[in-house]
Design a protein with these regions (language model features):
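Short amphipathic alpha-helices in soluble, non-transmembrane regions
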Residues: 1-5
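An extended, acidic, His-containing surface patch that forms the Zn2+-binding/catalytic region
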Residues: 9-112
Length: 112
């Protein structure tokens, strides 16, 4: 609980007001869609790491929990892109690779 955690840190003068939450969502790693995504990512970006769980406030639950569809997120940026920082950026090279990756994945999945 966030309120308990903040209090434990010694901040008694902080008020936490919850206006809403994002439901958790998870696609099983044995989904048949993972292999084409992994293959395309390897071909376009080279070596990469798969994170079976990733904290995110992306609305994946709409796809997984409501529509019953799998979701797989692939980052186009590199470790120096400072995600969600004021100076967040994406190189032109990674933008082009990301576009290629998306097109490749869509093609591979359409042929399944």
């Amino acid at each position: 609980n966030l309120k308990r955690y903040i209090k434990k840190l010694g901040y008694d003068n902080v008020e936490v007001i919850c206006h809403g939450i994002t439901e958790p969502a998870k696609t099983p790693v044995d989904t048949p869609y993972l292999l084409p995504v992994e293959k395309a990512t390897q071909n376009v970006f080279g070596p990469y790491m798969v994170y079976p769980n990733r904290p995110s406030t992306a609305p994946d639950y709409l796809w997984t929990n409501i529509l019953g569809l799998p979701t797989i997120q692939v980052r186009w940026c590199d470790a120096t892109s400072d995600n969600h920082a004021p100076n967040e950026h994406l190189t032109l090279s990674n933008y082009i690779k990301g576009t290629e990756l998306t097109a490749t994945v869509l093609k591979e999945i359409s042929e399944m």
